[in-house]
């Protein structure tokens, strides 16, 4: 909604433009009227809409054509004033003033116009019949108000309607010739209806209607008012109410009725509560609210975010089988301008029988939040998060983690989402490794309507010390790393080489020395294609010797043809190293972390006992 309103008064000389302004401000009819009033600003706190309002007078005798066009350009609404006792001033509306205001606007939005019949005290009856043909000819005319500056009649109402024409315009919502909602308005209201239909039965129950009413207007409807609304709909729209529930047709009819009765601010309140601008598009401020993410921090959904997206899943899982079929997924996407996720989704997250499971769905939300939080905020906005959850913005569904440097200092991360970069030469098996993380063999992945190129990210859940973590695998080709300084930041690095091609290990060793050797990121070398015979090693350190010398864990083995448990163990090891980065460089043998912790504790206790015994011996020897 606009932050201020600029009203311009036009009309023939002596119709009372200046008197109207001075009567509004002084609350009495002025005895002496200047040729033109100075621009007046009415503060927000004394206007019905709580918006500062600038009122500008025009005098044809004092101002030039260029000055008039400049004022028209700056105005938000124009009041064309005529004298109800002078029919010639009515005719000038059609022949002179409206062409001056909007005559140069062939297409696009036109300035809203209010017709103002002044001096109603000089004529009995009304001139509305005379101006109706003009109102029919020019759809930009919002309304006509008859008033009297001398008797202070309808002065406040005149400027209220002018404000209303700017803040709650009719033109974007309603086609007066067709007497129906414009397509963009009907589309926006249809989306709002779908968001408010929590059980997806294509109708709003009393409970859903009251939740909608409270979200938009701050209070529920009284039971009798609710019944009256449904009675009006039943009377006017076949199928507007079914099984005592308001259908989409009934919902659209109600909004049409509001507009036809001059209550279009009601429809605008609904639209703006769900993020729409005056052009009936979701505003950038609504879709992408401010969220500051300092360097070294990451973004995750918090409990409010996960609860909301899980409710959305359950709403669209109409057969309650725990997965979203393609049809159910299409239903979920219906409130978006374009589908947020493409066919690569089924090769990015865990699935069940080719359908999106709840776990995979939550994984996808987690991935988007981590990789591109602005897209996550927009997606939550399309789903109506701020309105349905009664929150200020989607940013309240996001947690910004503490800096990675602090995690490294404390020796443990509080993050629930961990990033693993999988680095290696082309052909070493990185894509197979990523798909194995989802429980797919590479052959299965390529047979299941896969996109031409498999995604470079996959995500799944892993348990670390009894806690569930989300682990993201990101595939990076070693060739690009050796040529350019790409972002190698991650929680754990997985350096993959082909056990049958020793040259690929040399590349991994080079990457390690260049990017990770002097840092604190834990690294794990993985020997892929472990089912193939080992190649002839070139002169130099073997992978095991290299890892031992650099105080790294022993290389792990992986084969897409190997047992599933060995793959799970590798992913668990990566997640554990990311969670406890300070332990990674002391891991010279495949001893489990929990066992090493026990051994350290036992060793400490034994040392304490020996120290105490030695002390007693020394005391006795004295």
Swiss-Prot record:
InterPro entries: EF-hand-dom_pair, EF_Hand_1_Ca_BS, EF_hand_assoc_1, EF_hand_assoc_2, EF_hand_dom, Miro, Miro-EF-hand_domain, MIRO_dom. There is a cross-link at residues 96, 119, 164 (Glycyl lysine isopeptide (Lys-Gly) (interchain with G-Cter in ubiquitin)). It is a single-pass type IV membrane protein. Ubiquitinated by PRKN in a PINK1-dependent manner, leading to its degradation. The chain crosses the membrane at residues 597-619. GTP 2 binds at residues 427, 429-432, 529, 531, 560. One of its GO terms (biological process) is mitochondrion transport along microtubule. The Miro 2 domain is necessary for efficient ubiquitination by PRKN. This is Mitochondrial Rho GTPase 2. It comes from Rattus norvegicus.
């Amino acid at each position: 909604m606009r932050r201020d309103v600029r009203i311009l008064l036009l009309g023939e000389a002596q119709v009372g433009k200046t008197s109207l302004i001075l009567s509004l401000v002084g609350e009495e009819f002025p005895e002496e009227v200047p040729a033109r009033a100075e621009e007046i600003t009415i503060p927000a706190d004394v206007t019905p809409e709580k918006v500062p309002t600038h009122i500008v007078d025009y005098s044809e005798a004092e101002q030039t054509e260029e000055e008039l066009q400049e004022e028209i350009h700056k105005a938000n609404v124009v009041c064309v004033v005529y004298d109800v006792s002078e029919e010639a001033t009515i005719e000038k509306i059609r022949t002179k003033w409206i062409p001056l205001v909007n005559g140069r606007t062939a297409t696009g939005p036109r300035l809203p116009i209010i017709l103002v019949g002044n001096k109603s005290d000089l004529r009995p009856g009304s001139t509305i019949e005379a101006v109706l043909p003009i109102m029919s000819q020019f759809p930009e005319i919002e309304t006509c108000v008859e008033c009297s500056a001398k008797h202070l009649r309808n002065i406040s109402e005149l400027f209220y309607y002018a404000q209303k024409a700017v803040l709650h315009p009719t033109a974007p919502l309603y086609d007066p010739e067709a007497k129906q909602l414009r397509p963009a308005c009907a589309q926006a209201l249809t989306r709002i209806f779908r968001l408010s239909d929590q059980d997806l039965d294509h109708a709003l129950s009393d409970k859903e209607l009251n939740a909608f009413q409270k979200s938009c207007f701050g209070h529920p409807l009284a039971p009798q008012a609710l019944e009256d609304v449904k009675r009006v709909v039943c009377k006017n729209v076949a199928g507007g109410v079914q099984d005592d529930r308001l259908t989409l047709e009934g919902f659209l009819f109600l909004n049409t009725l509001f507009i036809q009765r001059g209550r279009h601010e009601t429809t605008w309140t609904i639209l703006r509560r769900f993020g729409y601008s005056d052009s009936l598009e979701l505003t950038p401020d609504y879709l992408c609210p401010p969220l500051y993410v300092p360097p070294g921090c990451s973004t995750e959904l918090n409990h409010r975010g996960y609860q909301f997206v899980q409710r959305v899943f359950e709403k669209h899982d109409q057969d309650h089988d725990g997965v979203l079929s393609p049809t159910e997924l299409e239903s979920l996407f219906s409130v978006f301008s374009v589908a947020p996720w493409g066919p690569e989704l089924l090769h990015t997250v865990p699935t069940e029988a080719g359908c999106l499971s709840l776990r995979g769905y939550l994984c996808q939300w987690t991935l988007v939040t981590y990789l591109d939080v602005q897209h996550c905020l927009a997606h939550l906005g399309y789903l109506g998060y701020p309105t349905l959850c009664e929150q200020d913005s989607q940013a309240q569904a996001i947690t910004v983690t503490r800096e990675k440097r602090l995690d490294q200092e404390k020796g443990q991360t509080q993050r629930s989402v961990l990033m693993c970069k999988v680095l290696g030469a082309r052909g070493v098996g990185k894509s197979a490794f990523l798909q194995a993380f989802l429980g797919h063999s590479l052959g299965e992945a390529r047979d299941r309507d896969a996109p031409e190129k498999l995604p470079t990210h996959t995500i799944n859940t892993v348990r670390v010390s009894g806690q569930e973590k989300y682990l993201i695998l990101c595939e990076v080709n070693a060739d690009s790393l050796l040529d350019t300084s790409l972002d190698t930041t991650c929680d754990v690095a997985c350096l993959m080489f082909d056990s049958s091609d020793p040259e690929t290990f040399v590349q991994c060793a080079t990457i390690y020395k260049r990017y990770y050797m002097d840092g604190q990121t834990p690294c794990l070398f993985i020997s892929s294609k472990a089912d193939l015979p080992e190649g002839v090693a070139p002169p130099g350190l073997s992978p095991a010797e290299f890892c031992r010398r650099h105080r790294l864990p022993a290389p792990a083995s992986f084969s897409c043809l190997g047992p599933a448990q060995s793959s799970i163990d590798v992913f668990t090891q990566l997640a554990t190293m990311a969670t406890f980065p300070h332990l990674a460089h002391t891991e010279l043998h495949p001893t489990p972390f929990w066992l090493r912790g026990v051994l350290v504790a036992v060793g400490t206790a034994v040392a304490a006992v020996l120290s105490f015994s030695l002390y007693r011996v020394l005391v006795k020897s004295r």
